[in-house]
């Protein structure tokens, strides 16, 4: 399966039990910031934004004072799982980022999608990739 198929079929899909509820944008990005696959709606990000995200995975709490920035959008960092998941909130939407051995799985959402639904979609794919040694 291509990386694009993972984004299209497992991240940008209808959320279980909620037809027409899907993430706003999604991507799979290597730890080095190289995009493996992304939705057409995923924001263009700056290298320093990706560096900040990677630093927060290695030093949990790094982004808390300044917020998480992606594509020029600032998210308030909320509770995640140290070294494994970063979650952010902005207005009625937010972001979930799951770290795997080689990649970061991104999901961005807006209402009516809930934070929990975004977490489920992103973390399920991230856990699968971890099981596959990715």
Swiss-Prot record:
Pfam families per the UniProt record, alphabetical: Profilin
Keyword Coiled coil recorded: no
Protein localization: Cytoplasm, Cytoskeleton
Oligomer and partners: Occurs in many kinds of cells as a complex with monomeric actin in a 1:1 ratio.
Renumbered ranges of motif Involved in PIP2 interaction: 84-100
Gene Ontology MF annotations: actin monomer binding
Function noted in UniProt: Binds to actin and affects the structure of the cytoskeleton. At high concentrations, profilin prevents the polymerization of actin, whereas it enhances it at low concentrations.
InterPro entries, A to Z: PFN, PFN_euk, PFN_sf, Profilin_CS
Family: Belongs to the profilin family.
Additional notes on this entry: The variability of the residues taking part of IgE-binding epitopes might be responsible of the difference in cross-reactivity among olive pollen cultivars, and between distantly related pollen species, leading to a variable range of allergy reactions among atopic patients.
Major subcellular location class: cytoplasm
Protein name according to UniProt: Profilin-1
SMART domains in the cross-refs: PROF
Record keyword Disulfide bond present: yes
Any one Gene Ontology cellular component term annotated for this protein: cell cortex
Biological source species: Olea europaea
PTM statement from Swiss-Prot or TrEMBL: Phosphorylated by MAP kinases.
Keyword annotations from UniProtKB, A to Z: Actin-binding, Allergen, Cytoplasm, Cytoskeleton, Disulfide bond, Phosphoprotein
Annotated positions of the Phosphothreonine modification: 114
Domain of life: Eukaryota
PANTHER family: PROFILIN, PROFILIN-5
Disulfide bonds: 13-118
